[in-house]
């Protein structure tokens, strides 16, 4: 969970403890009796309760943690469960496992399912076949399989509050520290073509780092991502001029950029599309694509060994801040080393004024608008999950933020 340290930052003394400047005992958290937790915050934060459903905040059974030591959490028998279901037949290498109804769950009478069988299916075509055979009641499909099923009566589009985008390496000395080159890249990508022709799975073009379906801007009543969208999103002629001006500033006539992405079918297709789009529209540009296993691609990004990095983010809670904070200067997810005092200041002001919703969102909007001027990332398309769902399966909560919830699910 080290990559999520920042979500604790508003808890009293959390930052100082993380930096080794204060003792853990000074953390602004304490248990009052068996059923009450008191948390002291540095600043007001209306969405803090929403954050508490994230796994990073889950309580741990101290007795079991000490008992199992390094084995804790590596298999079902070394893990404690206090939710609707408890997991059985699982190890950290399992591709199949079962969740059975928890007899100690406080609202067990409202839970109709006795168990859920999970199966890892790496190929969408296989997932489709298993669904047709009746072996799966909820099957996630993507790529060409999803494209061919867009008119299927069992297909459900789950539009997540998430975006797929390209991180641009802006570190000191990197060629993309040049703003004109970054703006040229942004304006050269035909996102409509990407979503409709390449992905063709229900995805929609994305023009801001802030993902849709997180929250509405109280001033305009619009989805925050729509309210924050820049006016100009695609202009090839302008992109060429900016590109040539940027090259001139760097005393270059051509440029080689490396695009790092995972080796999933979707990321391969998106990588090829970006390579073609950028090379054909920006004179003197060569894009070398490196499709690697996700962990290997991430390691390169985390160590700054990329020019372009195809990535994504799903909001952890229903607030644009969830995503925007990942590009603050000190955030561990800021792989491209975006550095903007104005951007950071707006987020800081948002935190200080979080108790007043209108003021809070006005600062978030200004932060996104600042990013629109700086081009630290290339937003590409919104995140959609295509699910084949048993027509008799009811009561599932399809959350745009968070995980799919089967707590009250049942079969008709």
Locations of the language-model features?
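Aromatic- and charge-enriched surface segment that lines or borders ligand/interaction sites
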Residues: 1-10, 38, 175-177
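Gly/Pro-rich hinge or "lid" segments in bacterial periplasmic/extracellular proteins
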Residues: 12-16, 22-24, 41-111, 115, ...
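Extracytoplasmic/peripheral linker and loop segments enriched in polar/acidic and small residues
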Residues: 21-25, 231, 284-297, 324-390, ...
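Alpha-helical secondary-structure segments
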Residues: 34-38, 114-115, 163-209, 255-265, ...
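Ligand/substrate-recognition segments at binding pockets and active sites
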Residues: 92-94, 236, 244-315, 330, ...
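Ligand-site clamp/hinge motif
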Residues: 101-149
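Structural transition elements
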Residues: 204-245, 266-268
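Long beta-strand-rich cores associated with HINT superfamily self-processing modules
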Residues: 387-412
């Amino acid at each position: 969970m080290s990559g999520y340290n920042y979500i604790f930052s508003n808890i009293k003394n959390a930052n100082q403890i993380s930096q080794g400047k204060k003792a853990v005992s000074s953390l602004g958290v304490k248990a009052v009796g068996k059923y009450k937790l008191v948390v002291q915050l540095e600043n007001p934060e209306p969405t803090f309760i929403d954050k508490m459903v994230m796994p990073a905040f889950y309580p741990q059974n101290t007795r079991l943690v000490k008992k199992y030591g390094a084995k804790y959490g590596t298999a079902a028998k070394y893990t404690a469960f206090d939710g609707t279901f408890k997991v059985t037949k699982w190890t950290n290498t399992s591709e199949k496992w079962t969740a059975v109804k928890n007899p100690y769950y406080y609202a067990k009478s409202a839970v109709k399912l006795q168990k859920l069988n999970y199966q890892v299916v790496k190929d969408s075509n296989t997932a489709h076949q298993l669904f047709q055979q009746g072996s799966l009641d909820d099957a996630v499909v993507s790529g060409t399989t999803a494209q061919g099923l867009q008119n299927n009566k069992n297909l459900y589009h789950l539009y997540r509050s998430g975006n797929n985008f390209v991180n641009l390496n802006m570190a000191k000395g990197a060629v993309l520290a040049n703003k004109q080159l970054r703006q040229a890249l942004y304006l050269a990508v035909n996102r409509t073509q990407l979503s409709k022709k390449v992905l063709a799975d229900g995805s929609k073009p994305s023009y801001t780092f802030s993902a849709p379906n997180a929250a509405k801007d109280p001033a305009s009543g619009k989805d925050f991502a729509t309210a924050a969208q820049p006016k100009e999103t695609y202009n090839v002629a302008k992109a060429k001029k900016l590109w040539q001006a940027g090259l001139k500033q760097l005393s270059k006539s051509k440029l080689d950029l490396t695009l790092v992405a995972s080796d999933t079918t979707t990321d391969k297709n998106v990588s090829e599309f970006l390579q073609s789009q950028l090379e054909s529209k920006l004179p003197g540009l060569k894009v070398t694509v490196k499709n690697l296993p996700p962990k290997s691609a991430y390691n390169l990004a985390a160590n700054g060994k990329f020019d372009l990095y195809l990535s994504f983010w799903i909001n952890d809670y229903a607030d644009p801040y969830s995503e925007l904070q990942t590009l603050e200067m000190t955030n561990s997810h800021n792989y491209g080393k975006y550095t903007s005092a104005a951007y950071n200041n707006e987020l800081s002001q948002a935190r200080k004024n979080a108790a007043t919703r209108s003021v809070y969102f006005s600062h978030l909007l200004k932060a996104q608008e600042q990013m629109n001027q700086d081009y630290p990332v290339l937003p590409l398309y919104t995140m959609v999950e295509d699910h084949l769902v048993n027509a008799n399966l009811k009561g599932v909560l399809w959350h745009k933020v968070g995980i799919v919830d089967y707590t009250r699910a049942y079969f008709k």
